[in-house]
Design a protein with these regions (language model features):
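PAS-family sensory modules
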Residues: 1-58, 132-135, 142-156
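Sensory/regulatory domains in signal-transduction proteins
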Residues: 46-156
Length: 156
């Protein structure tokens, strides 16, 4: 039998596993491509170990997942970022452009070849040179969040 804390943790793992399953399916549906995930692992490990940064947020714009590469890129830990607003990743000067971009993703389902400036937790700016951002949809075709995979970035 699980203690209350362990049961909560298992529930969270199941919840993120389901979200990542929808993220993977949505990526393929929108882009006609596959995410570069290792096939011989469970889904969470495949996302976690992907060499490219992958992050997602829920329908309200709060981070619900970052893989190891994304945590490293943004210089954060999961405890520092999960449940926090994704606005923290863009400098104030880029917020208007960021909002415009997310609205385009809402309208079109995804955007390829995204470029934009982002900021790490210690204030260092970097340029995303190539990324895909897509809507994550559930089995009933309801939008449940958005996700990004970053193919290339450079320090500024």
């Amino acid at each position: 039998m699980f203690s209350r804390g362990e049961g909560s943790l298992i529930g969270e793992v199941e919840k993120i596993n389901k979200f990542l399953e929808f993220a993977q399916q949505s990526f393929t549906k929108h882009t006609n491509k596959l995410l570069p995930l290792e096939k011989n692992r469970d889904l969470i490990s495949s996302f976690d170990e992907c060499l490219l940064p992958i992050a997602s947020h829920d329908i309200n714009g709060f981070f619900n997942y970052l893989n190891k590469s994304a945590l490293s890129l943004f210089k954060v830990t999961k405890d520092q970022v999960i449940g926090r607003s994704t606005t923290m990743t863009a400098p104030k000067s880029e917020q208007k452009q960021r909002n415009k971009l997310l609205n385009q993703v809402n309208s079109h389902g995804f955007i390829d070849n995204y470029k934009g400036v982002r900021v790490t937790s210690d204030g260092e700016l970097f340029q995303i040179e190539d990324a895909t951002i897509w809507n994550v949809i559930d089995k009933n075709s309801h939008k449940i969040g958005q996700a990004v995979i970053i193919y290339k970035s450079n320090k500024l």
